Amino acid sequence: MSHPSSIVRRVSKQIMVGNVPVGGNAPITVQSMTNTLTTDVAATVAQIKRLEAVGADMVRVSVPTMNAAEAFREIKALSNIPLIADIHFDYRIALKVAEYGVDCLRINPGNIGNERRIRSVVDCARDHNIPIRIGVNGGSLEADIQAKYGEPTAQALVDSALRHVDILDRLNFDQFKVSVKASDAQLAVESYQLLAKQINQPLHLGITEAGGLRSGSVKSAVGLGMLLSQGIGDTLRVSLAADPVEEIKVGFDILKSLRIRSRGINFIACPTCSRQEFDVIATVNALEERLEDITMPMDVSIIGCVVNGPGEALMSDLGITGGSNKSGFYEDGVRQRDRFDNNNVIDQLEAKIRARVSRTDQSNIILKV
């Protein structure tokens, strides 16, 4: 059921990444980054399409060489989703991909070079109507900032960001977003909190190099959740040492948990105990996998007994409450005459969910690729 968020978002300027708005009152977008060799055009395009299929709003692609820039030209032509070029060290690569229709340029203040090079990138971005992300990272701060602070601190990250914000301001360029990422969640949170008080540009959130699928998801949920709950953030990436598709899933789960942006099914399930009347864990695991193609927001409660089951079902779009031999089924908080055989809960509940989606809108089902 609909539970609108009470979070008040920070007011930020809106920019466009391709046809996707970022900032202002636009939905908070979810993005990922390819981990294929960019020169392998087929593999990179295939991964971009997989990311698009699970809901990515935009995708970043690393462009480390001029050969990769030439490959990016083909990749862009074969992609429907906005693409961001990740540029480090060689500013001339940014100029090249701008010619090839890139939707956004990510530059790293720690290695992109002097102000003359930044001016060249900005002039090119302006000519091609391309926004820029100033992407500060705690692991690659400028040498003088590292020397000043000794180690990455919130103020160090923000100083790096503001130095480059000042350059863009002096160049009268305002089509940019900013990130101040760190691998330490608390450091990242403090950095974004500090930066949010000083600029009104859209903020790209992320805990960089967060870790593997489990630990990285937890670290990202804690850090990004803290910021999002304070209204900070306009777009996000969950950085995982895992399949990039998982980054999109976790990103939407974070937004869904805060009732900021819902996509797909929100399962409410008990941790189980000896009172369960059917196998809750197997049911949830099976349905999460089977129903990945559903994009329609929906709360589904799966509770193994009558202690909390009826109460959770009252607050869900669909719900099942464990009972002896057969379990009770609820829709829109109302108990239905249907009762589920406890040995066939998975198939029966999947059928009910798909029927509800079909009655609402077939566009809420995506094709798997």
Curated annotation (Swiss-Prot):
Needed cofactors: [4Fe-4S] cluster
Associated pathway: Isoprenoid biosynthesis; isopentenyl diphosphate biosynthesis via DXP pathway; isopentenyl diphosphate from 1-deoxy-D-xylulose 5-phosphate: step 5/6
GO MF: 4 iron, 4 sulfur cluster binding; 4-hydroxy-3-methylbut-2-en-1-yl diphosphate synthase activity (ferredoxin); 4-hydroxy-3-methylbut-2-enyl-diphosphate synthase activity (flavodoxin); iron ion binding
Annotated GO biological process: isopentenyl diphosphate biosynthetic process, methylerythritol 4-phosphate pathway; terpenoid biosynthetic process
Keywords: 4Fe-4S, Iron, Iron-sulfur, Isoprene biosynthesis, Metal-binding, Oxidoreductase
Protein EC: 1.17.7.3
Pfam name, any one: GcpE
PANTHER family: 4-HYDROXY-3-METHYLBUT-2-EN-1-YL DIPHOSPHATE SYNTHASE, 4-HYDROXY-3-METHYLBUT-2-EN-1-YL DIPHOSPHATE SYNTHASE (FERREDOXIN), CHLOROPLASTIC
HAMAP family: IspG (MF_00159)
Protein name per UniProt: 4-hydroxy-3-methylbut-2-en-1-yl diphosphate synthase (flavodoxin)
